[in-house]
């Protein structure tokens, strides 16, 4: 059985060689994620070119995702290495560029003294250390240690419950975004999204560069959770970034928020990735914990489009095993749940949405061997995918970039074909491609969804039941 949920792999030192990339793709990688928090453009370009070459050599439509760092708040560097802070210690965080020690450290975020008030909590290193702000003096935030531990260079700071005034896009993010648009990435992810209008900042730059790519919102701030429906509407997809989200929200809320995001994304035909610590123990062990296996399985059974590996594939000791393990878990979960995925109660709001819903229902009634979408933008395929039909979903497109973009969407297998001007020619393309590949046989029924006339994005208006091998003539 073909796996329907997609696998996103973060690339890094453990997986940047051509040999490792080939193994990753063979093991099941559908999307390669580039974490632009690390490395430089030259290094990333080298790996990007390798991904494209290896994927083309293997005949696989692997998508490539550029993940922008966003306004991540970090401490600076410590002059003599890590220091230990104990309960009750006074510790200062300053915007001055000073070497860190047991009494103070600098921060990358110049707006910290303006955002923090006495009594606010500051979390360090994903909440491993907890500080309470006691006063603000100019560019210095004085804190008292509530939960101590080791603190070292460049550790992250989280400010739960605080409205951070940092911009949606930093100068570094803008430079990285322009580079990614010019390089040829398939998708962009924006970190620390707080409001729907954050999408406008990125799209304005896309407009300047004359490149429009799908934009994913990473949900990792409580402010974003408060405005989920609007953010899902404003962006082209969502990543449930459970690392920072689990630090800033009560831990017990994360699974509930995750399921809510998946449901909202299915309603709006937006792809959704569940990310962070999915098989975390496999960074250093060849097998995951039972809890991790359950985590992946339930994300798949809840209807996520994709599940993601981070450190497991970027710096872990078992990157290939992590992908093959995730592949096996997802397949097993789908074998159990494919016919039992929650149906969407909400009726479609557009003509294209109504036709996609009808196609899924007609396919089940006539015993179709495939649901086929002809698409210029990928939207028709995404609308079909949200119904999670057990019938294989095949997308045909003449737009090469759409193949990479649909690599993130549940269940979609994409074929690149020449553009044709008539719907009957589309049907001939389907027959020729799928008979040659041995995917279908004469007499098989398929349900075809397309726009007429062909070539107009967003014009889905036709549904057709076709028997493979039957005569097709121009009308």
State what each model feature region is:
Residues 1-475:
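Non-catalytic helical/linker scaffolds that mediate oligomerization, partner binding
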